[in-house]
Amino acid sequence: MRHRLQALAVLIAALIALLSPSCPTIVALSQGAPTPAFHHVHLNSLDPAAAMAFYTKTFDVTKKTNLAGLDAVQSDNMYLLFHKASTAPLIAPDSAIWHFGWGSTDMEADYKKHLAAGVSFHTPMTRLGSGTLFAYMKGPDGALVEINSSQTRAFIHVHLYSDAPLCAAEWYQKHLGAVSRATAPRTGPCEVPFAAPSEPLGVIRSPATTVKIGEVNLIIYPRQRPGPLVSTRGHVVDHIAVSYPDVAAALERLRKSGVKVLEELHRFGKGKAQAAMIEGPDSIAIELVGRE
């Protein structure tokens, strides 16, 4: 029944594309692909215990837990996992993962609270033209951790860089089953010239787009440096992970679609679930984790 419904969704998307006078670009989920959930952010750390203590102390929606025999920090339905690094992880903004962060229902109060608790900030509280307030914390091992205005205090986003943000969004939709947050269908090619940097902070903000996996937004901005982005492996944020009911089936589907496989099927941690690693747009490493 599930496969029949997914096939019907693909057919409907194709019909919409044919009937629309403006021929908007519609990205259909690969046939047979189940809906994913966001699973975890995997960090490299010189001192995982200290890093876990930072996150659980700083964000009251988190707690220390055990996941498949691995020490982890849980934030609602997602996790932070840690690999003990023998050398300091890379922190240069030259990979696809820029930062990650939580929401704040009262930015001014939370910012003052964090300052009073001794949290250091890379970027102080700043207001965007939209009125949104944000700030970047100096996290453990050089990680950049954002808090920003939101209706929730949950872990809400991972911010990415891309050589072609709109193309990357299409990849996440087609191959992983991400949902576009765009307010209107896009027309034309996905490769679009970058705009000039804008304030605040002199950031290149266009073209940009957002897709959602489970409860987490992947916000995709243009890369801020010349030259292609490098692999996320070895950086402070080593990779992100999504979960599927059947990892073996998901991996085979992706392989047939031409997606690069970095790690074949293996056991996830010390549990019964399977896992694998693929490479997504801009050399981002993405782990696939089975749902037990």
Please provide the spans of the model-predicted regions.
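N-terminal secretory signal peptides that target proteins for export/translocation
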Residues: 1-6
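Bacterial N-terminal signal peptides
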Residues: 9-24
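Boundary of Sec targeting at the N-terminus
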Residues: 26-34
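Core segments of cupin and vicinal oxygen chelate
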Residues: 33, 39-85, 128-131, 136, ...
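Short, structured motif recognition centered on aromatic/hydrophobic residues
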Residues: 38-41, 80, 97, 145-147, ...
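Vicinal oxygen chelate
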Residues: 46-50, 75, 95-141, 163-167, ...
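Short beta->alpha transition motifs characteristic of CBS
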Residues: 84-86, 148-152, 182, 288-292
